[in-house]
Amino acid sequence: MIIHYLCTTLFFVFINMQRIVLFDIVKALCIVLVVVGHYIPENSPVWYECLNKLIYSFHMPLFMFASGFIYMATKKEGESYSKFLVKKLKRLMLPYVVVSVIVISIKMLTEKHAFVENPVTAYAYIKMLYFPEAGYFLWFIWALWWMFVIAPLFATKQKRLLLLGAALLLYCIPPFLPEVFCLKQFQSMLVFFILGAVCCDWSEIATSVKIPFWAVCLSFAALEYFYIRFDACHSVIPFVGIATIIYLSDIISRGAKKINGLLTISATSYIIYLFHTTFEGAAKAALQKFAPILLDDPFFAVGAVLVISAGVAGPMVLYRYILAKYKLTQFIFGIKRQQAASDRLPAA
């Protein structure tokens, strides 16, 4: 019942749907949370472990929600199903294959000379075709692909409401789909993607009711306390976390005079997702060699900021000066020419 209540509340309340810039900000905040969440060294202090647990409680559902909303907001009427899937293959799966080959090759070339987390064998080049072998975080791309396979089959608002009900049921029952092709993650994330699509469908209703921001934040803080302290409220937190970040993004979009930095991060969010662990790993290796004191208390926070900054800024520089510059890299990383010219990267 409480999950149903939170879904309904989110459905009717939390989004200023008329302003796509809101979801640019959501994407920017979300990708930063992803980069922070994926830096968790073994010697992390307790406060950082708690922060990491908090981020993991909702950040990927938030990403799925934003993807579902943007899918509906940018959906082309009359586009054939086959053409849509081919487009998503180019935008999602081709970059996934290319990045997987690059990361696996780097691991195989360096693991004999330096420490490599999650070392691989030559079989990884085959396994990556059905499992995110290059890096487990790449499961998101597989799961998002399945969202795009399923969602267009439910072509009306009413059908998407039925799909939302089915997705909520899949979310509530224990996972039963296999991990191959990341179907297990697809099962748990479908509800958030479809919820985003449904909220876009009914945007005129969603803006008619208001809940105070303080009430949303208080609910989120209380649930996170019980989650971190007692390992409870797993199923509920993602919905409240989504609402909190969307509310925060709406405040930023209306109140900030300059949000170009966030919009730039949002524009390169997919490239950041693909490459952030590579740049974080390089930054961590550099600190281990030249400034190991920054990897432990009392300077852990300084080192963490440097590594996380590399995870965000590195892919942005790569995108601007290499990937968006050449036709070949534009093709293999799913970057449209007009998009490269404007330095904007739409949601996958």
Language model feature labels by segment:
Residues H4-A348:
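Alpha-helical transmembrane segments and their immediate juxtamembrane cytosolic regions
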